[in-house]
Amino acid sequence: MAKEIERKFLVRGCAWRALDEGELIRQGYLSDEKARTVRVRLAGKPGKEKGSITVKGITSGVSRLEFDYEIPAADAAAMLERLALRPLVEKIRRRVPAERLPGASWEIDEFLGENAGLVVAEIELPDEGASFVRPGWLGREVSDDPRYFNSNLLAHPFGAWPEAERQAILAEIRGEAD
């Protein structure tokens, strides 16, 4: 049984952009129930994409069950086209390996489409109490806010959040607020 322990943060400023060129990720959900999600993903450059299917359980604190399997890219593309709920979640993911920041690897997601403007960093940890180095571009923790779950960004995209709230978050991301 696989267990994912993940913490999620807003990202401030733009220094993180230089860390990695990133890869395009397109993902959709076959199920987005609170107790379980089934996600299909295509990641990589066109023609060199990799497909995956992931089943996740309900989140408890910062952990949940997660089962992730590679599938043929053509199968993932067909599922995204024919079966996935709409809209798809699209983002550019940048990876910061543990060698560059002591502790654990970071993934920084810059959302596109209906979630454009939102930038979130995630770190997977070996246990819930694990310590880690907080890079200067790390903003407010949003691990316990379900609005930031990718599956929830499908039904409630960032672009549809109340304008005042969205603008406050965008100011945080730009580094204009604390």
Q: How would you label these PLM feature ranges?
A:
Residues 1-178:
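Phosphate-end processing signature that detects enzymes handling 5′-triphosphorylated RNA
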